[in-house]
């Protein structure tokens, strides 16, 4: 590896002959924060095959037959922590990543997985909050102007066309305040936006604004002008056949399947001496009767033969099922050229549902920019029905939070709906229902996408730490796990995803990061008579010193621990929850923020209610302590970067939310569902799996690469940092024998391989490229 340390992939104790799931770095590309480099990107990691050339600008030497590094970076500005790669989306068909940052959307070409390169930049005139792709479209959200509390926007673009090197803007749609998440659904015909509605003092209007948290749906119709894919695709669909009487494994109960398959596409022609053409995508499956499943997708075409010294063609992707048919088998890999073996088969079509593409007839709505054939209809979904006093009382009793109720003295209004802050979006398999996390509120909203209504708000409740280990103090200056049987915390999930088990039951997975405690300010000019600032947390010791809890609680083991700085005395507890209604200045109970792990909730298909089926407990924090003790509960980035080294931040987050499990990605590999968890604090990935026939996850390993032995600035200059620098990386998913992991760990016994990646959220996405299952992490 180019970082000078072995790959560390970590796992729980397994038998010596058993293997665990891990990651292996394939390539990493540093992105500029101002303009495209003139001389090409930094060289990537070497590939397999004959000897490749050396990489310029820090690129690694190619392996046998692998590509050399790119030309040196002769243009563009590169710097640490500049928000270059905040969110990303990946087009598997064209092998292009769309990476959104503070000033640009940058298009990265991964057709050469060893040596990716930036092929286009789109100036965005402001930061990109989130980005998604589907079909011929790319969509990203941006906060409002001139102030972040103003209405934000959704930008819809035609995808990058390699032939014209253009990416045309189609639509600009007003959404809600702080549009933090975007997701396509229903065959690219629907875009869902979560508008967080964060409050703040508007310096332009001289008002304190607490916008409504809302959800925007944008229904699309018409067509775009982008040319056809370079991949040869067979468009002959299989006819719908007789439906089976039992559902396919992994599909919802009560569904059936029409098994007819479409034909496979033809393989592309190899180009001497370059890479062979990609096999065509298999035909789309036939349509079954609703709610039956559509036909199985066709087998992907055979990849083209590689030229001398070139890469073999990738097998075609299996055709998608129709509604929601099983995906087709991946095509056979093409024959390799000199020095190469045959390419691996392409990805089989996913079991996710596929809808007809965007209707070709425009809707009676707004016509998009630059086209007379694309139109959209916007719907705004609010939470007003939950403002009824009975609803507020019901939800608060279930620990659905409303942290801010006017504590700064602003005129308001301070309705319950204004306190709700949607953050992340996931979907059921039919893409009829959206599940949207309300992190600050410790809840998940269930949204009917066909009727544009919120069905319910589901509470995430509390996590009790009885029997579990936790290091909840930064004052002990080290790793000190203790057990507090009376300690409770709010999970407060950030990212959420879904998966189906073999019985067809739906599970919602949550990354229980815990919300960042609110620290709000309002000038006396805008909030006359107010306190000027509001904080929703206080250290545990203050609850005891000020006698804010009932005497039995103060005398309990929990109260005694809260009196000790090295136990729970320096831990942060909520000042807006557990309040005594008869005496609001006192508390009946206390709660910390975050679950320090992930959870899986089983969804009732009739009531839509969720039941906790599994929680990761304390495994993530304990595994970080075991394998990365030097940066345990550390910070991903700290100032001043020219002096601070990553290991200096050790234990700094223990009093708060600990590891901060922030993001999620779920995928299928060789029959196993894999769950990747982005851990913000130490910038690592925890890997869990759900085996065929099982319903709940099992911990696999912990992954991290890089160094911690120099300042952040020095690590960046030596290309040994990750996400703080604004990079995009590809990792191969591999099985590693446990004995090999132990041997690898022996080369770095102090666990000093870790490196900061950034303080912002991970963005993880999956792709099948060059026969390998890869994880792309915006880093």
Swiss-Prot record:
Extent of Gly residues compositional bias: 262-351
Transmembrane parts of this sequence: none
Pfam families: choice_anch_I (PF22494)
Keywords: Cell membrane, Glycoprotein, GPI-anchor, Lipoprotein, Membrane, Repeat, Signal
Leader sequence segment: 1-15
Predominant subcellular localization, coarse grouping: membrane
Bilayer topology annotation: Lipid-anchor; GPI-anchor
Region (Disordered): 249-363
Tissue-level expression: Restricted to the primary mesenchyme cell lineage.
Entry GO CC: plasma membrane; side of membrane
Role played: Not known. Could be involved in mesenchyme cell migration, adhesion, fusion, or spicule formation.
Name of protein: Mesenchyme-specific cell surface glycoprotein
């Amino acid at each position: 590896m180019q970082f000078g340390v072995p790959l560390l992939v970590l796992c729980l104790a397994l038998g010596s002959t058993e293997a665990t799931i891990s990651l292996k770095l394939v390539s990493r590309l540093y992105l500029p924060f101002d303009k495209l480099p003139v001389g090409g990107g930094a060289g990537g990691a070497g590939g397999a095959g004959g000897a490749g050339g050396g990489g310029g600008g820090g690129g690694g030497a190619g392996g046998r037959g692998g590509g050399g590094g790119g030309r040196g970076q002769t243009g563009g500005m590169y710097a640490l922590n500049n928000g270059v790669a905040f969110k990303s989306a990946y087009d598997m068909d064209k092998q292009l990543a769309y990476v959104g940052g503070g000033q640009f959307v940058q298009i990265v070409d991964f057709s050469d997985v060893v040596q990716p390169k930036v092929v286009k930049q789109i100036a965005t005139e402001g930061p990109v909050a989130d980005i998604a792709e589907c079909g011929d479209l790319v969509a990203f959200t941006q906060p409002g102007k001139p102030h972040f509390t103003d209405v934000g926007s959704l930008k819809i673009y035609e995808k990058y066309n390699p032939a014209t090197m253009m990416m045309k803007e189609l639509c600009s749609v007003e959404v809600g305040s702080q549009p933090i998440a975007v997701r396509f659904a229903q065959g690219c015909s629907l875009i869902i936006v979560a508008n967080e509605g964060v409050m703040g003092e508007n310096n332009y209007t001289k008002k304190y604004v607490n916008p409504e948290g809302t959800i925007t749906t944008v229904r699309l119709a018409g067509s775009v002008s982008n040319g056809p894919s370079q991949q040869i695709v067979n468009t002959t669909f299989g006819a719908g056949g007789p439906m089976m009487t039992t559902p396919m494994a992994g599909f919802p109960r009560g569904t059936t399947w029409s098994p007819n398959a479409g034909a496979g596409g033809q393989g592309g022609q190899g180009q001497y001496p370059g890479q062979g053409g990609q096999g065509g995508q298999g035909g789309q499956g036939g349509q079954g009767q609703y709610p039956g499943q559509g036909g199985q997708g066709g087998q992907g075409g055979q990849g083209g033969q590689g030229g001398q010294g070139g890469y073999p063609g990738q097998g075609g992707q299996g055709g998608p099922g129709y509604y929601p048919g099983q995906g087709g088998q991946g095509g056979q890999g093409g024959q390799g050229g000199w020095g190469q073996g045959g390419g691996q088969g392409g990805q089989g079509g996913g079991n996710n549902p596929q809808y007809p593409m965007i209707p070709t007839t425009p809707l009676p709505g707004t016509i998009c920019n630059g086209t007379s054939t694309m139109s959209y209809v916007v719907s705004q979904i609010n939470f007003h029905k939950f403002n009824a006093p009975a609803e507020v009382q019901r939800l608060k009793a279930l620990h659905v939070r409303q942290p801010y109720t006017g504590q700064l003295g602003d005129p308001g209004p301070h309705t319950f709906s204004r306190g709700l802050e949607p953050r992340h979006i996931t979907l059921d398999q039919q893409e009829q229902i959206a599940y949207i996390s309300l992190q600050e509120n410790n809840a998940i909203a269930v949204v009917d996408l066909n009727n544009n209504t919120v069905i319910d708000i589901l509470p995430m409740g509390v996590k009790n730490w009885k029997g579990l280990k936790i290091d909840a103090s930064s004052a002990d200056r080290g790793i000190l796990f203790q057990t507090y049987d009376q300690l409770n915390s709010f999970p407060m999930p950030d990212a959420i995803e879904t998966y189906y088990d073999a019985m067809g039951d739906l599970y919602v997975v949550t990354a229980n990061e815990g919300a960042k405690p609110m620290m709000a300010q309002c000038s006396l000019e805008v909030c006359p008579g107010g306190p000027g600032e509001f904080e929703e947390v206080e250290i545990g010791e203050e609850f005891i010193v000020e006698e804010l809890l009932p005497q039995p609680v103060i005398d309990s083991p929990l109260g005694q621990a809260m009196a000790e700085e090295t136990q729970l005395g320096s831990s942060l507890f909520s000042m807006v929850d557990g309040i005594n209604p008869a005496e609001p200045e006192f508390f009946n109970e206390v709660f910390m923020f975050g679950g320090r792990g992930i959870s899986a909730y089983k969804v009732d298909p009739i009531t839509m209610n969720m039941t906790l089926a599994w929680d990761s407990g304390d495994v993530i924090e304990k595994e970080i302590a075991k394998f990365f003790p030097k940066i345990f509960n550390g910070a991903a980035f700290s100032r001043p970067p020219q002096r601070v080294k990553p290991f200096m931040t050790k234990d700094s987050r223990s009093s708060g939310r600990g590891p901060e499990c922030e993001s999620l990605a779920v995928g299928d590999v060789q029959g196993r569902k894999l769950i990747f968890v982005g851990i913000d604090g130490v910038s690592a990935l925890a890997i869990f799996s759900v085996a065929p026939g099982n319903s709940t996850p099992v911990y696999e390993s912990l992954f991290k690469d890089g160094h911690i032995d120099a300042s952040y600035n020095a690590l960046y200059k030596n290309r040994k940092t990750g996400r703080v620098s604004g990079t995009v990386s590809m990792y191969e998913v591999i099985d590693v024998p446990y004995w090999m992991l132990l041997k690898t760990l022996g080369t770095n016994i102090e666990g000093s391989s870790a490196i900061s990646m950034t303080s912002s959220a991970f963005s993880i996405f999956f792709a099948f490229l060059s026969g390998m299952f890869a994880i792309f992490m915006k880093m």
